Design a protein with these regions (language model features):
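Export/targeting segments at the very N-terminus of extracytoplasmic proteins
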Residues: 5-52
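N-terminal export and membrane-targeting signals
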Residues: 1-3
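Catalytic and binding regions of secreted/periplasmic enzymes and modules that target cell-wall glycans
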Residues: 19-20, 28, 39-41, 54, ...
Length: 122
């Protein structure tokens, strides 16, 4: 019982432990992804950031930049982020849910789910 309670307490209030998804952010996902992909993207968001808008990974040695926000967009997408979000400060822009999901939508439209595969960076 203590383990079950610990498991429940370790999941952020805005995340769904049962579905491992981010229902709070699904309306935003629906604006940038086809309806059939929204449940998948919600689960990816949960896996990437546990539904935390301001999630920031350590700086990657390979790029010299962190992965940022709900979808953990790689800092290497700076040019795309500047174009899509019309902001120069890439990290600050990607910490905003609207921008982060908009960039994720752009990536999906230009490569599908491959951007979130475990091997996409190799």
């Amino acid at each position: 019982m203590a383990l079950a309670l610990l498991a429940v307490l370790s999941v952020p209030a805005h995340a769904s432990a049962a579905a491992n998804s981010c229902p709070k952010w699904e309306p935003l996902l629906k604006r940038h992804f086809p309806a059939k992909v929204v449940p998948v993207m919600s689960r990816i968001m949960y896996r990437e950031s546990r539904c935390t808008e301001r999630a920031l990974s350590p700086v990657r040695k390979s790029t010299g930049r962190p992965d940022v926000g709900l979808m953990q967009i790689q800092g290497s997408w700076a040019t795309v982020t500047r174009a899509v979000c019309k902001k120069q400060d890439v990290v600050k822009a990607l910490l905003n849910a609207q921008c982060n999901v908009k960039v994720a939508g752009y990536l999906y439209n230009n490569g599908g789910l491959g951007h979130w595969r475990a091997t996409s960076g190799k």
